């Protein structure tokens, strides 16, 4: 016979039960209710954690599904006037969900100005950023300017079409029929056709054969000018041999005229003849082997130990002749002989000189002081002839006791 469920309830609620039993039964019910509540809360928390962990994965999957992938893609970017600013062909293009960036593979592209191609680029990989305002190019990067034939290579390249600027942040190299160059970094302004080279710059001109070293260099390709505003070393080669070398704080080489303009702390050395020229400004023609200065100049022949200074001067390293004008002074360190004049003709490497205008000759042994209008002779061995010039001009000789 089935028991009535209500009878159990009546037993629990039976007032005939003892107080102790009633109290124990109440405690048991409270604990049971608390246990049920704790288990329910834990289950809910675990469910929420599971849901929260699954949400990012779901979002990532959704983002992945939103990415646009194009094969054999062509991307165009117009300027404000609607003209094509740049065009890129890529074997594969993967766009971000917001369509603001794209990852590219096997890239070829063109940069346009006024409807004409001014730069052709190639790279294995790249990224279009900032709605096409910046393009990063990597791996086997090459850029060519069809207007002048210059080719640029490097790593970690940033192309900013709106600024007409190409930045090569590592291992820059540039080549042109007239010049090759390398540097740590490089910048190319396509509107001005100007390269800026930064850090450990080396440049080699083909004709004449010149090798330049500096820390900062501008290469104006269209004008054929190479300009440095830092200390610059230039070596002239004949075959594999250095024939002349120069150093200056500022230098400009014209690749068209083959002339170098050197300024500030200029020092030029020649091996044949063995000569050193120091001045603040000099025009050096390596091909013609001439050096011209309109500033105070100092010429030293270390072989004969003869030094000449003047307000201006020019030296022909080919014919081995120096012409000095204005406040000329020649000194032989061997015997302390001195020759002063307005003009001086010096046949190098010998110490033979011809002087004109307000000539003064001095020697120490034997002591002698002679003045006149002209002088000729060998300064190193004190064999100098001083003349008065016209018949009414006298030579004054003072013998110092």
Regions from the PLM with identified roles:
Residues 1-401:
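Mature-chain termini and adjacent capping regions
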């Amino acid at each position: 016979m089935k028991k009535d469920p209500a009878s159990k309830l009546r037993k629990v609620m039976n007032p005939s039960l003892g107080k102790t039993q009633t109290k124990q039964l109440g405690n048991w019910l409270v604990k049971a209710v608390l246990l049920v509540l704790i288990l329910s809360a834990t289950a809910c928390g675990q469910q929420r954690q599971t849901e929260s962990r699954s949400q990012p994965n779901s979002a990532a999957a959704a983002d992945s599904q939103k990415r646009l992938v194009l094969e054999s893609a062509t991307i165009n970017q117009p300027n404000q006037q609607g003209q094509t600013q740049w065009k890129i062909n890529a074997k594969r293009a993967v766009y971000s969900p917001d369509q603001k960036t794209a990852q590219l593979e096997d890239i070829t592209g063109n940069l346009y100005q006024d409807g004409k191609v001014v730069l052709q680029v190639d790279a294995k990989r790249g990224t279009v950023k900032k709605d096409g305002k910046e393009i990063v190019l990597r791996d086997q990067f090459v850029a060519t300017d069809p207007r002048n034939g210059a080719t640029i290579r490097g790593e970690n390249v940033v192309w900013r079409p709106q600024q007409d600027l190409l930045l090569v942040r590592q291992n820059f190299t540039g080549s042109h029929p007239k010049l090759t160059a390398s540097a740590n970094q490089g910048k190319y302004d396509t509107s001005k056709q100007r390269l800026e080279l930064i850090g450990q710059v080396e440049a080699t001109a083909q004709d004449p054969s010149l090798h330049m070293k500096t820390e900062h260099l501008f290469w104006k390709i269209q004008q054929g000018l190479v300009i440095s505003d830092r200390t610059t070393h230039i070596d002239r080669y004949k075959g594999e041999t250095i024939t002349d070398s120069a150093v200056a704080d500022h230098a400009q080489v014209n690749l068209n005229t083959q002339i170098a303009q050197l300024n500030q702390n200029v020092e030029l050395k020649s091996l044949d003849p063995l000569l050193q020229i120091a001045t603040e400004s000099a025009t050096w023609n390596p091909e013609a082997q001439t050096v011209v200065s309109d500033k105070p100049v100092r010429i030293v022949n270390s072989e004969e130990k003869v030094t000449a200074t003047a307000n201006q001067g020019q030296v022909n390293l080919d014919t081995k002749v120096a012409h000095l004008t204005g406040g000329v002074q020649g000194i032989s360190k061997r015997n302390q002989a001195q020759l002063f004049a307005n003009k001086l003709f010096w046949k190098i490497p010998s110490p033979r000189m011809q002087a004109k205008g307000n000539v003064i000759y001095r020697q120490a042994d034997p002591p002698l002081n002679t003045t006149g209008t002209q002088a000729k002779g060998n300064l190193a061995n004190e064999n100098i002839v001083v003349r008065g010039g016209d018949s009414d001009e006298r030579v004054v000789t003072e013998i110092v006791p």
